[in-house]
Amino acid sequence: LSAEAMAEHTIGVMLMFSAKLLLSVNNQRKKFWQKYVMNDTLYNKNLLVVGAGKIGRCIVSKAKAFNMNVVGVKKEPTELQNFDKVVATEKLSEYVAWADYVVCTLPLTSETEKIFNYDMFCKMNSEGIFINISRGKLVDENEIIKALEEKAIKGAALDVFDVEPLPKDSPLWDMENVIVTTHSSGRIENFIDKTIPVFIDSFESFTKDKKPKTVIDLDKRY
């Protein structure tokens, strides 16, 4: 249910960086009129979607409208619609260097916890933007702060954090190259009303000994 909203959120924050809207918001707060702001575009940029599940696929379907080049990262690579290529998780460190935008939609497991650490950020393109809309513990928070301070990456859009609410003393709040949102990328109006039909469908499948559409694998944890 949240996939469409999360995908639109992702496209939105990418545009915040490419169209220099984040810069303009920061300048507005300072009442600073910056001449000759040069915008970029998403056209022909490289997008790495780490986690090619429903949310990742939804992001890619929208990214293709901007003619972005898209590679997906998946534990078990398969050909997927709209992706130019899908590679195994073992190749993540290779492809982060290729990407202009790295979007994390991975599930949190023992294998993926803190998969994005300082070493991984240092392998990214120094002009790259990191976006996390999945789980806070996929990222080593202290190490992304270090990477941002050292300009190992250009910026980040973070919707999830190790501790929520994000502590007021976190440096992330004050970084001008960081967009902080409050675990809200998937929140939509009338969410409860929209979940009821899904619940009824799953419940009816369960009572008829059929596999519900929303079942998860408890061993994989997703």
PLM region spans:
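Hydrophobic "lid"/C-terminal helical patch
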Residues: 10, 14, 99, 148, ...
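Rossmann-like adenosine-cofactor binding region
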Residues: 77-171
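Glycine-rich Rossmann-fold phosphate-binding loop(s) that bind the pyrophosphate
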Residues: 52-53
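N-terminal Rossmann-fold NAD(P) dinucleotide-binding loop
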Residues: 56-57
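Phosphate-binding beta-alpha-beta segment of Rossmann-like dinucleotide-binding domains, i.e.
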Residues: 1-46, 65
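C-terminal helix-to-coil terminal segments
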Residues: 1-9, 23, 164-222
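Short beta-strand "acidic-cap" motif of Rossmann-like dinucleotide-binding folds
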Residues: 70-72
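Gly/Ala-rich phosphate-binding loop of Rossmann-like dinucleotide-binding domains
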Residues: 60, 64, 148-149
